[in-house]
Amino acid sequence: MEPPRGPPANGAEPSRAVGTVKVYLPNKQRTVVTVRDGMSVYDSLDKALKVRGLNQDCCVVYRLIKGRKTVTAWDTAIAPLDGEELIVEVLEDVPLTMHNFVRKTFFSLAFCDFCLKFLFHGFRCQTCGYKFHQHCSSKVPTVCVDMSTNRRQFYHSVQDLSGGSRQHETPSNRPLNEPLTPQGPSSCTQHRDPEHFPFPAPANAPLQRIRSTSTPNVHMVSTTAPMDSGLVQLTAQSFNTDAAGNRGGGDGAPRGSPSPASVSSGRKSPHSKSPSEQRERKSLADDKKKVKNLGYRDSGYYWEVPPSEVQLLKRIGTGSFGTVFRGRWHGDVAVKVLKVAQPTAEQAQAFKNEMQVLRKTRHVNILLFMGFMTRPGFAIITQWCEGSSLYHHLHVADTRFDMVQLIDVARQTAQGMDYLHAKNIIHRDLKSNNIFLHEGLTVKIGDFGLATVKTRWSGAQPLEQPSGSVLWMAAEVIRMQDPNPYSFQSDVYAYGVVLYELMTGSLPYSHIGSRDQIIFMVGRGYLSPDLSKISSNCPKAMRRLLSDCLKFQREERPLFPQILATIELLQRSLPKIERSASEPSLHRTQADELPACLLSAARLVP
């Protein structure tokens, strides 16, 4: 019979204290409990565990007898253990540990992990790395969570589902864009019925990995997506409004007015002008109009390159959005001929408006935009990158990078994406294929923007379909429930998958061979990259940043300013071996230190 675990009933005499027991608790803590008659080990240690955020279900208790640990049941009476020592340890399969908070002043740029606001004075856990304000302390979990251990059990259940789901019917009668809610692993294992969890039938061919050094083919065919180009259109409209004002002359004539002279002739001037003065004013107005029109053409017209000036040399690769060629135009360039067959007037105007935004991008981690072509089809000219893509280095050439180099690649990628987002440019197709290592380890991000090309059009209206590669797609992009699912957070999710490639050296979901199954499970929240495969020497802060970037809810993902600040702080904290300033060369011989005159004199001595 289980002993009582609550206080004594009314009228009962309180248990009498007969001694003490010394208890060693997790995280190098210890306490002394009083031994009372009629109480068990469970009751005696209940308060000591609760104040430390633990409970008996996640712990095991040992008796320390002659230096050896012996497992003891929780319902053992405490009275016979008077004067002995007990040891309480957390179960190995329960990834829980206590926080180790310290007060900290963040002199470098840092953000609170809960309110995501700027953090200067606050607290930090030395174990899991949580940073927070004092008023955000109520949101901190009571225990530290090791995400790599916590997800391991979940992935075993997912693999069981993926292995045993081939006999289920395909969800052809169940559209993917119905309301989706993420389910926990328990719900996945309980509902094996096809009506509750219908898996798509796996394809015969596994996922293909395109091994091209340039922009290769993506994993979805004919799945270009709409893009809300509101930001681009607002910029273009304001630009066109200013240009229209310039073409109207300096007197503020409307766009539809025939000429500045006709407007000026309609005004009543207080002084009559002679015909010669009127002709002089008209000629001055015409000269101003010509100068301003030429200025407008300089800002946008000369970015369009005539096709006769560009020479295509070699085909590099083909993707879902176009074909990349190596070409010559005042030097080596990369020319991407876009797949837009018979563009409409709306598409042509939207493409030119977007080029007006892309031409203003200048950053060390962004491929330099050099121009565009509209005849005979849409094409973009960028700088030529001699290096290979990050995909080629990691998955084809198997290039070995040390952890410092991997973190630096992650920092440069975050720096380039932070610049694009500051320009209100959403990448929409960020992946390791579009990240190039130029002249060593300098990161160059390419194939950004291009909302006009990455949208399927039906006449003048865009179609709502996802674009990009399956492995790098966020759940909200796969579901396409929102009118515009692409956001800064969807780029953050794709960046999280790139981090996963850097820290594991492999692609996610390599154990699943069906693309449709990946789309279905990721869109519903049943599947995410397995963090237990991360390298053991990966810093704890990088592991936690990777987990945050891959959150199912996009509101919970950090933005690139916070990501960049976290990686820069991590880089500064890494140990470095620096050369001594007083000894520039460690391999200098003793003879090198002697003056030349002494050496010549030594040779003359017989």
From Swiss-Prot:
A zinc finger (Phorbol-ester/DAG-type) spans 98-144. It holds the Pfam family C1_1. The modification Phosphoserine is found at residues 157, 162, 186, 257, 269. It catalyses: L-seryl-[protein] + ATP = O-phospho-L-seryl-[protein] + ADP + H(+); L-threonyl-[protein] + ATP = O-phospho-L-threonyl-[protein] + ADP + H(+). One of its GO terms (cellular component) is cytoplasm. Residues 158-207, 241-290 are annotated as: Disordered. Its cofactor is Zn(2+). One of its GO terms (biological process) is MAPK cascade. The active site is at residue 429. Residues 254-267 have a biased composition (Low complexity). GO terms for molecular function: ATP binding; MAP kinase kinase kinase activity; protein serine kinase activity; zinc ion binding. Binds 2 Zn(2+) ions per subunit. Interacts with TH1L/NELFD. Belongs to the protein kinase superfamily. TKL Ser/Thr protein kinase family. RAF subfamily. This is Serine/threonine-protein kinase A-Raf. The lineage of its organism: Eukaryota, Metazoa, Chordata, Craniata, Vertebrata.
